[in-house]
């Protein structure tokens, strides 16, 4: 079983913000693979299904970004998942819109959601897919909690299916395969 987690913040006011790109990817994958993400459990909302004949759980933690690790830890403990069976997708301000970066493991890189996950899991050896949301021109909080411009939103709508494909590559094969295929790609 593979856990696919999209990071974001709960609540209408955060929908379609840069910080909620992980939620957007989970919504896309749920629709594409006919997985109902509607069960409130493990401090989140989740659903089970199959991708590439592998059982997956899609999860959107409802703890707010900075406490995401609590939700993931509860689910991972319940299903006895290893860290490398958890894939996390989230926003990255160091990448331009249209770029993504897959990593097998690594530090939080200043992302509080990832910091919470590392603290709660007790390690950093879980694959992650970083989705570029562009660099802030001024205030970081306003940037990540702000909505995309109309032009950027149209661009991100082209990016989300590619992010989904990168995650499926990890599910099917592994993070290295996905890294080779998707790192460095610029989605126009």
Swiss-Prot record:
GO terms for molecular function: peptidyl-tRNA hydrolase activity; tRNA binding. The active site is at residue 19. It catalyses: an N-acyl-L-alpha-aminoacyl-tRNA + H2O = an N-acyl-L-amino acid + a tRNA + H(+). PROSITE patterns: PEPT_TRNA_HYDROL_1 (PS01195), PEPT_TRNA_HYDROL_2 (PS01196). The record marks 9 as: Discriminates between blocked and unblocked aminoacyl-tRNA. The record marks 91 as: Stabilizes the basic form of H active site to accept a proton. It comes from the Bacteria. Pfam families: Pept_tRNA_hydro (PF01195). Its main location: cytoplasm. InterPro entries: Pept_tRNA_hydro, Pept_tRNA_hydro_CS, Pept_tRNA_hydro_sf. The keyword tRNA-binding applies. TRNA binds at residues 14, 64, 66, 112. Its EC number is 3.1.1.29. Monomer. Hydrolyzes ribosome-free peptidyl-tRNAs (with 1 or more amino acids incorporated), which drop off the ribosome during protein synthesis, or as a result of ribosome stalling. Catalyzes the release of premature peptidyl moieties from peptidyl-tRNA molecules trapped in stalled 50S ribosomal subunits, and thus maintains levels of free tRNAs and 50S ribosomes. Belongs to the PTH family. This is Peptidyl-tRNA hydrolase. It comes from Clostridium perfringens (strain 13 / Type A). The lineage of its organism: Bacteria, Bacillati, Bacillota, Clostridia, Eubacteriales. The gene is pth.
């Amino acid at each position: 079983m593979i856990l696919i987690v999209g990071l974001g913040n709960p609540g209408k006011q955060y929908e379609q913000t840069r910080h909620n790109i992980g939620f957007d990817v989970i919504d896309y994958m749920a629709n594409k693979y006919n997985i109902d993400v509607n069960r409130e459990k493990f401090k989140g909302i989740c659903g089970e299904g199959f991708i590439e004949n592998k059982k997956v759980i899609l999860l959107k933690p409802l703890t707010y970004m900075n406490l995401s690790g609590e939700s993931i830890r509860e689910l991972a403990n319940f299903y006895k998942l290893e860290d490398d069976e958890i894939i996390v997708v989230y926003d990255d301000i160091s990448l331009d819109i249209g770029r993504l970066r897959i990593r097998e493991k690594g530090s939080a890189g200043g992302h509080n959601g990832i910091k919470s996950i590392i603290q709660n899991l007790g390690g950093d050896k879980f694959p992650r897919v970083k989705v570029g949301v562009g660099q802030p021109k001024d205030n970081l909080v306003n940037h990540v909690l702000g909505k995309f411009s109309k032009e950027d939103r149209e661009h991100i709508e082209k990016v989300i299916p590619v992010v989904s494909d990168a995650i499926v590559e990890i599910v099917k094969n592994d993070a290295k395969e996905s890294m080779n295929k998707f790192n460095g790609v610029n989605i126009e």
